[in-house]
Amino acid sequence: RSLMKNAFNLGVGEILTEALDELGIGRDRKLEITRAVIRSDYEVTAPYQCVYALPDRAGAANVYLRSELGDVDWTELEEESGTLLAEVLTDEEIDVLGPRIEAMDPISSTSWPLERAAADEDFVYFISAGVDPEKRGSGAFRRLFTPFLEYADEHGLACYLDCYTERLEQLYGHFGFETVERRSIDAFPIEERLMVRRAR
């Protein structure tokens, strides 16, 4: 599986960037890689109306409506994003990160909503969403997140997302998401929480 953004979700990303310590890579380069992960994802999903930002740039989200992807398979976009990311990484970084990402595959899937939805069912999937740390507590996340939920409710659509921390699980729970499955593997001390919000 290609290097891809989902592997850099909170929790998973920490484990992967720790792996870069083996190469003596410092904080600045780790930050550069993390930004490249997000940028590569945005670059391939933006043509499908998946990238959104608040007018004041306090927050941004990568969210797709299944029907807007048309005939494109989500895994194709992941592969394309991974290819773009690989162009930024050195061979040594790929050698260190690649095996870890492969090993984490069972707890970093972004195609699980397709396993739960009917073949012709439209839905909203949150790939990533974040707020400028300096804007936390300002209501920026609610301003970013709520319009997607309102759209889903108006159109009778389920929303899907996954996260890796109890704090985020609780946050999304306040917006009506329920954890439907937890995934973990012995090799890494993290747990993926698969969450669904039904239309209201």
Feature locations, PLM:
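Conserved acetyl-CoA-binding loop-helix of GNAT-fold acetyltransferases
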Residues: 131, 137-150
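Conserved active-site alpha-helix within GNAT-family acetyltransferase domains
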Residues: 154-156, 165-182, 188
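Helix-loop element at the rim of GNAT/NAT acetyltransferase active sites that forms part
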Residues: 2-29
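Conserved acyl-donor/pantetheine-binding loop and adjacent beta-alpha core of acyl/acetyltransferases
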Residues: 60-130, 136, 186
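Short hydrophobic/aromatic beta-strand or adjacent loop that forms the aromatic wall/cage
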Residues: 58-59, 190-195
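Conserved GNAT acetyl-CoA-binding A-motif
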Residues: 123-124, 151-164
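Conserved beta-hairpin
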Residues: 43-65
